[in-house]
Amino acid sequence: MRSWIPLLVLFAVLAVFAQAGKSSESDESRRRPSKSSESSDSDSKSSDSDSSSSEESSGDVPSEAPNTDSTPVEILAAAKPDSGILLGPGDNRVKRDGLPSFYDIRKKRGLPSAYDIRRK
């Protein structure tokens, strides 16, 4: 009963490889221009352009990649806080003076502090 599951997986893998092979063949046929009956000078020029296009396509960097030498990059430093809070990486807290702390709220309500709760 379960013997058909690996068979389906095998067919799916083969179909993916076959489709990839067809697409790469069609890409190659589009890249190479068809030769026409022109003078030998134009044939030599087209063969030179074929070799240059294959050299360009073999590189890892696509031709549309922006040139990083001409793009200015600004690095902005964070302003150091005057409130005494030491900021860590990814810590964007801002000390607000007007709000009471949890300790102040619990003290005002007559509740034990978090330290007292942990100590017990």
Curated annotation (Swiss-Prot):
Keywords: Signal. Residues 1-18 form the signal peptide. Residues 20-99 are annotated as: Disordered. It comes from the Eukaryota. The keyword Signal applies. This is Uncharacterized protein msrp-7. It comes from Caenorhabditis elegans.
